[in-house]
Amino acid sequence: MKKKHLLKIIIAVAIVITAAMFIYLLAGNHTAADEALWALSDTDGVTVANTGSGITFTPAENPHSTGFIFYPGGKVDAEAYAQLAHGLADEGILSVIVKMPFDLAVFNSGGAGSVIDAHPEIKTWIIGGHSLGGVMAADYAAKDDRISGVVFLASYPNTDLSASGLKALSLTASNDGVLNRGKYDEALRFFPRDTIFYEIEGGNHAGFGSYGAQDGDGGAAIPPAKQQETAVRQIMEWMQG
């Protein structure tokens, strides 16, 4: 009888924990702000395909034969990064935002593989991500030699990439109140050796996307659109450098 009673307690606790996890996963997600939604539409130079697995921004011309795969930040809707991806496509870069289960890249860290397989015309692949997305993007880059470089937006690698030979760009923002600077500094030894570091003055954590304010973040002195324009410019200069 005691064993049966203990088993019932264990099952009840497991149910409560599981329910709590699902509530956490489904609650508090950041949806795309209205100003990002225009970027989900086709323009003269970019065609947008929004599917269940991701959002693809295809430029009318891709003189670079380069593709950019992007992993969203934790609990942030993929559409919140449409302006950033559209901006890169305007510069001739095929850009794909990978959608994540529960908006958490840890549940689809290998999503870049199917993107690469679907675009054999692309010769050079760059992967990047915001916050948690950047961590998972770095993990993927360490495992797939088809990746040539990594872009970190308010993020850092947990995997040691120092001897990987990968190109890398680290973009941070001066008013970011979410990025753990202590962990970022500790992770500096894991960045590829020739990583380029650039801080966007006046930007904050949420400004790398368009999804409104984020708890704990600093106030931005520039709008998200300006921060993302700066990010696009820095990414293009780094790619072409």
Region locations from a protein language model:
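Short beta-strand/loop motif that positions the catalytic acidic residue
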Residues: 164, 170-172, 176
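C-terminal catalytic-base region of ester-bond hydrolases, centering on the histidine
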Residues: 187-241
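Gly/Ala-rich beta-loop-alpha elbow adjacent to hydrolase catalytic centers
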Residues: 128-137
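N-terminal Sec-pathway targeting helices
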Residues: 1-18, 22
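Conserved alpha/beta-hydrolase
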Residues: 85-105
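Short beta-strand element of the alpha/beta-hydrolase
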Residues: 65-73
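Short alpha-helix in the alpha/beta-hydrolase fold that links the catalytic acid
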Residues: 84, 179-189
